[in-house]
A protein has these predicted regions:
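Peripheral docking tails and interdomain loops at the edges
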Residues: 240-326
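Conserved thiamine diphosphate
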Residues: 38-90, 267-283
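N-terminal alpha/beta PP-like core and its mobile active-site loop of ThDP/TPP-dependent enzymes
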Residues: 8, 12-58, 86-87, 107-109
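Conformationally flexible catalytic loops at phosphate/diphosphate-handling active centers
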Residues: 84-179
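Glycine-/acidic-rich phosphate or pyrophosphate-binding loops and their flanking alpha/beta elements
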Residues: 165-188, 317-332
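Single conserved hydrophobic/aromatic residue that forms the stacking wall/gate
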Residues: 1-6, 11, 353-356, 360-363
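Anionic-ligand anchoring segments at beta-strand to alpha-helix junctions in alpha/beta enzyme folds, i.e.
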Residues: 191-217, 333-361
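Short acidic, glycine/serine/threonine-rich loops at helix termini
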Residues: 12-14, 35-41, 68-71, 95-102, ...
Length: 363
């Protein structure tokens, strides 16, 4: 497991791990990288910095998804011979106390490809069956050898999909490389990954009741990015796409996920659909349903931000009043702490006691 410091410091090692086809999995709680100021809270700055290392990247949106999809990363790494960076939002997901359905090791036993494990063991450095590894190569052969990894990455989306289907069969879920949620005839679609997808889901439920034609595509397998699987879930009726990135790459014409989506849509039936790009949630800035509604309503700003009032470059979208999107019967509480005053600990203990009381079983 790793967070910001560990994730950033081992980038150079990841090139070697991926290059030597070592099937490791690093679980990362995605956090902000310090720039003009230190911020230890959640965004995707650190994981995006690793996107060209050769690690596959799998993203979860909730605590339950972390439980369900982490085995997919491990099994796919073994069979696909590609290491995985398995990430979820720092603090918002990593520190959330939530009821989940737990897996047992026995549940996972029949999912593991023992033939792939044995093949990996046979590739261990051993004088009985020597092999060459980690050599220094000159310009005459390095390029060719580097390209030889292509078949593994081309095959990996199907490997991940195979294990997602095994999880689905076991627990009745519907995990895919890209999951769509919303109206079947949606005209406005957001593409995002991470915990913001839960906020978007809740907002969509609210908007569907009002007759809006909206939806969201949740990215689960970010690397390798499978254009085929993205296009398979894109509504044929879409007229506008907004891509939300939880990072800022100064000087770029767009953030990483946006650039991937634009490239995936090129030369397809969706090539003429306008694609907007927006930033949100840097340093754990809250993202609310009102801001998601502003994204759906935006038709003018091709590049935008939400959650702040940008009075310098005027990229922020105007936000309307906050709607009540929570289901009826839900009571929400927010507790403010001053830092090291025991607020977090007290709430954790209180929650544990309430959950143990039979009249509070639905917490």
């Amino acid at each position: 497991c790793a967070c910001l410091v560990g994730s950033e410091m081992c980038i150079r090692d990841r090139y070697k791990i991926a290059g030597e086809q070592l099937p490791c999995v690093i679980d990362v709680s995605a956090r902000c990288v310090a720039t003009h100021a230190l911020n230890i809270f959640g965004d995707h700055s650190d994981v995006y910095a690793c996107r060209q290392t050769g690690f596959a990247m799998l993203c979860e949106s909730s605590v339950q998804e972390v439980m369900d999809l982490t085995p997919v990363a491990h099994c796919a790494a073994i069979k696909g011979k590609v290491p995985f960076l398995n990430f979820f939002d720092g603090f918002r997901t990593s520190h959330e106390i939530q009821k989940i359905e737990m897996w047992d090791y026995e549940d996972l036993k029949d999912m593991v490809d023992m033939d792939a494990i044995n093949a990996f063991r046979r590739h261990a450095l051993n004088p009985e069956h020597p092999c060459q590894r980690g050599s220094a190569q000159n310009p005459d052969i390095f390029f060719q050898a580097r390209e030889s990894c292509n078949p593994y990455y081309d095959a990996l989306p199907e490997v991940v999909e195979e294990y997602m289907n095994k999880v689905n069969a076991k627990i009745g879920t519907d995990y895919k490389l890209f999951n769509y949620y919303g109206a079947e005839d949606a005209e406005k679609v957001i593409i995002a990954m991470g915990s913001v997808c839960e906020t978007i889901d809740e907002t969509i439920d609210y908007l569907l009741k009002a007759g809006e034609k909206v939806g969201v595509i949740k990215v689960r397998l970010y690397r390798p990015f499978s254009a085929k699987h993205l296009l398979a879930v894109m509504p044929k009726t879409v007229k506008q796409i907004s891509v939300l990135d939880r990072t800022k790459e100064p000087g770029s014409i767009g953030e990483p996920l946006y650039l991937d989506v634009v490239a995936a849509l090129k030369d397809t039936e969706f090539a003429d659909v306008p694609v907007f790009t927006g930033r949100y949630g840097l340093g754990s800035k809250d993202t609310t349903p009102a801001q998601i509604i502003a994204v759906y309503n935006n038709t003018e700003k091709k590049r935008f931000t939400i959650g702040i009032n940008d009075d310098v470059t005027n990229l922020s979208l105007p936000t309307g009043p906050s709607p009540v999107t929570a289901p009826e019967g839900i009571t929400s509480c927010k507790f403010w702490g001053l830092g090291a005053d025991g607020t977090v600990g007290a709430n954790t203990v209180s929650y544990t006691h309430l959950r143990a009381h039979e009249t509070c079983a639905d917490l």
